[in-house]
Amino acid sequence: MKFDRHRRLRSSATMRDMVRENHVRKEDLIYPIFVVEKDDVKKEIKSLPGVYQISLNLLESELKEAYDLGIRAIMFFGVPNSKDDIGTGAYIHDGVIQQATRIAKKMYDDLLIVADTCLCEYTDHGHCGVIDDHTHDVDNDKSLPLLVKTAISQVEAGADIIAPSNMMDGFVAEIRRGLDEAGYYNIPIMSYGVKYASSFFGPFRDAADSAPSFGDRKTYQMDPANRLEALRELESDLKEGCDMMIVKPALSYLDIVRDVKNHTNVPVVAYNVSGEYSMTKAAAQNGWIDEERVVMEQMVSMKRAGADMIITYFAKDICRYLDK
């Protein structure tokens, strides 16, 4: 009987390494950090074991640890002392993210700062824009100028990449126009243009204190049941000028990661979100899985699906695994 002998290329660790199609590198990773304005806080987030809210005055040690491990891209999320109905803290000169960015760039000029450009962490209602008094929904067009102000403020503080996550229609076009008019032609936009209204975001909202005080985000984030809608969002953001595209969440949406990769030549970013992280951590802490092997398999699955970069709370752990 004649048959194919595929096992020839699996015969040893060296052989398997030689023919491996996808690899996870430190350069692929973007590490999220939650920064609070209050002094002397390093508080572990209960629903995100091993992830902390960190004060501005303690940020340097966290940045040094990440940098020394080989991480070269950071994404800051701010937890401000005060909030209002229009998210003023997102775009003021001395906002928590602006301060964190200046600290990071002063320490390491080659550390890329990816700015999460949204209002939900700064609004007292927890939504990603201005609320219409009549519909009690987010007013898309009134929110856009505030997002532009936020992006410009973040770049002025030293951000290298703008990553708008609010899912307002036209947000990429307006931010691109605003950045260009301000002279920031070379600042790329990493759009969260394929962002689903996912239940996997729960622990993040604990970490960033950004849960909506009423309703949900289903009128602006995507329905998890939809696949073709992702391609429509992608097409719009590409026309509007995005330079990179985020798919969020990642692990339950690997088909979407592959679809996006197949329909664009811009880099694709997978966001390994908080709920995905927490499930893995919980199973590992109970001894049900081998954390290192499962984490690396998850990362490889995202790369195999088409991700060029991965935003993950496991970034420091992955660097340690790769150093072994």
UniProtKB/Swiss-Prot annotation:
* The organism's place on the tree of life at top rank: Bacteria
| A Gene Ontology cellular-component term | cytosol
Key word Hydrolase present: no
Binding residues for 5-aminolevulinate 1: R205, R217
Q: How is the cofactor bound?
A: Binds 1 zinc ion per monomer.
Instruction: State if Lyase is listed as a keyword.
Output: yes
Recorded GO molecular functions are: porphobilinogen synthase activity; zinc ion binding
Q: Which UniProt keywords apply?
A: Heme biosynthesis, Lyase, Magnesium, Metal-binding, Porphyrin biosynthesis, Zinc
Q: Where does 5-aminolevulinate 2 bind?
A: S274, Y313
What biological processes does GO assign it?
heme biosynthetic process; protoporphyrinogen IX biosynthetic process
Catalyzed reaction equations: 2 5-aminolevulinate = porphobilinogen + 2 H2O + H(+)
Residues of the active site are K195, K248
Q: What class of enzyme is it?
A: lyase
Name the PROSITE patterns on file: D_ALA_DEHYDRATASE (PS00169)
Membrane-crossing residue ranges in chain numbering: none
E.C. code: 4.2.1.24
In this chain, Zn(2+) is annotated as bound at: C118, C120, C128
Cofactor(s) this protein requires: Zn(2+)
Q: In which pathway does it act?
A: Porphyrin-containing compound metabolism; protoporphyrin-IX biosynthesis; coproporphyrinogen-III from 5-aminolevulinate: step 1/4
Q: Where along this sequence does the record place binding of Mg(2+)? A: E233
Binding partners and assembly:
Homooctamer.
Give the family from UniProt.
Belongs to the ALAD family.
What this chain does, per the entry, is described as: Catalyzes an early step in the biosynthesis of tetrapyrroles. Binds two molecules of 5-aminolevulinate per subunit, each at a distinct site, and catalyzes their condensation to form porphobilinogen.
Q: What is the official name of this protein in its record?
A: Delta-aminolevulinic acid dehydratase
The organism that produces this protein has a lineage beginning with: Bacteria, Bacillati, Bacillota, Bacilli, Bacillales
Give the encoding gene's name: hemB
